[in-house]
């Protein structure tokens, strides 16, 4: 029979197991500061890796660049003066969490660059674009194009696309003047996609949940059996003492 103490311990173990499972199903989050995934050589960018709470912020971080694990294990990876070799796929992973979604950084050399905060956005999401001049020179009379059609004449930068729709997908570029000379950036594709919903998402949680329940129940039963065994020993010991006392009296 499971005692009250064993039942409480069983529940405590179950909640602890569930907490571990829920934590392990969360992904690390990788961000850029400034937020642009396209930058010029010589520019600075800081990559930061976050967990789901402030305690994980100080935990060990694994950084992976183009499949190679970095020696850096802090929450921030700072690229002081970017080179073309810094281009590529970045992934981070906080201790106890899944790996982050990959971020693709493109480091290039040109006079004018169409910068963007993302190359893929979910419907109803948002992203920013900016027409960026070499060595941070001021860009004047900026025109933004999507699929070769002008859609924004902006003297303010950046331009924010909010509540993105599928119609916002396309190839973007910009034109503008640098020191009285007109330049055109290269083209870059930004995709707006629908969120993918897996019909069997619950299967990702039910198996570890069952394992946690079985672990907690087995532990509770083990402790309950141990307590019952101790009780039997006490009863046997008490019975022996009574038998000895009876023999001494007779």
From Swiss-Prot:
Function: High-affinity receptor for immunoglobulin epsilon/IgE. Mediates IgE effector functions in myeloid cells. Upon IgE binding and antigen/allergen cross-linking initiates signaling pathways that lead to myeloid cell activation and differentiation. On mast cells, basophils and eosinophils stimulates the secretion of vasoactive amines, lipid mediators and cytokines that contribute to inflammatory response, tissue remodeling and cytotoxicity against microbes.
Quaternary structure and partners: Tetramer of an alpha chain, a beta chain, and two disulfide linked gamma chains. Interacts with IGHE (via CH3 region).
Glycosylation, residue list: 58, 66, 73, 106, 152, 167
GO terms of biological process kind: calcium-mediated signaling; cell surface receptor signaling pathway; establishment of localization in cell; leukotriene biosynthetic process; mast cell degranulation; positive regulation of calcium-mediated signaling; positive regulation of granulocyte macrophage colony-stimulating factor production; positive regulation of interleukin-3 production
Transmembrane region(s): 205-223
Classification via Gene3D superfamilies: Immunoglobulins (2.60.40.10)
UniProt note on tissues of expression: Expressed in bone marrow mast cells, as well as in the pineal gland at night.
Ranges facing Cytoplasmic side: 224-250
PANTHER family for the chain: HIGH AFFINITY IMMUNOGLOBULIN EPSILON RECEPTOR SUBUNIT ALPHA, IMMUNOGLOBULIN FC RECEPTOR
Extracellular-side positions: 24-204
Boundaries of every Ig-like domain copy: 28-104, 114-181
InterPro entries: Ig-like_dom (IPR007110), Ig-like_dom_sf (IPR036179), Ig-like_fold (IPR013783), Ig_Fc_receptor (IPR050488), Ig_sub (IPR003599)
Record's subcellular location: Cell membrane
Record's signal peptide: 1-23
Inducing factors: Exhibits night/day variations with an increased expression at night in the pineal gland.
One CC-aspect GO term: external side of plasma membrane
Recorded GO MF terms: IgE binding; IgE receptor activity
Gene source species: Mus musculus (Mouse)
Stored Pfam families: Ig_2 (PF13895)
Name used for this protein in its record: High affinity immunoglobulin epsilon receptor subunit alpha
Disulfide linkage: 49-92, 131-174
Alphabetic keyword roster: Cell membrane, Disulfide bond, Glycoprotein, IgE-binding protein, Immunoglobulin domain, Membrane, Receptor, Repeat, Signal, Transmembrane, Transmembrane helix
Principal cellular location given in the protein's record: membrane
């Amino acid at each position: 029979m499971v005692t009250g103490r064993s039942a409480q311990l069983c529940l405590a173990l179950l909640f602890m197991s569930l907490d571990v499972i829920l934590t392990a199903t969360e992904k690390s989050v990788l961000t850029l500061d400034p937020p642009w995934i396209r930058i010029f050589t010589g520019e600075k960018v800081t990559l930061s890796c976050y967990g789901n709470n402030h305690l994980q912020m100080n935990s060990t971080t694994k950084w992976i660049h183009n499949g190679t694990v970095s020696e850096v294990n802090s929450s921030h990876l700072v690229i002081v003066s970017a080179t073309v070799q810094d281009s590529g796929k970045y992934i981070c992973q906080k201790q106890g969490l899944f790996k982050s979604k990959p971020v693709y950084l493109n480091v290039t050399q040109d006079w004018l660059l169409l910068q963007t905060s993302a190359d893929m956005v979910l419907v109803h999401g948002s992203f920013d674009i900016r027409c960026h001049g070499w060595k941070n020179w001021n860009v004047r009379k900026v025109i933004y194009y999507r699929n070769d059609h002008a859609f924004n004449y902006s003297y303010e930068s950046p331009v924010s696309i909010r509540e993105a729709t599928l119609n916002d997908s396309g190839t973007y570029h910009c034109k503008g003047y640098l020191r009285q000379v007109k330049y055109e950036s290269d083209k870059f594709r930004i995709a707006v996609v629908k969120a993918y919903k897996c019909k069997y998402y619950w299967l990702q949680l039910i198996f570890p949940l069952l394992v946690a329940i079985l672990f907690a129940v087995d532990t509770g039963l083990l402790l309950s059996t141990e307590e019952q065994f101790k009780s039997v020993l006490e009863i046997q010991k008490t019975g022996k003492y009574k038998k000895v006392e009876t023999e001494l009296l007779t």
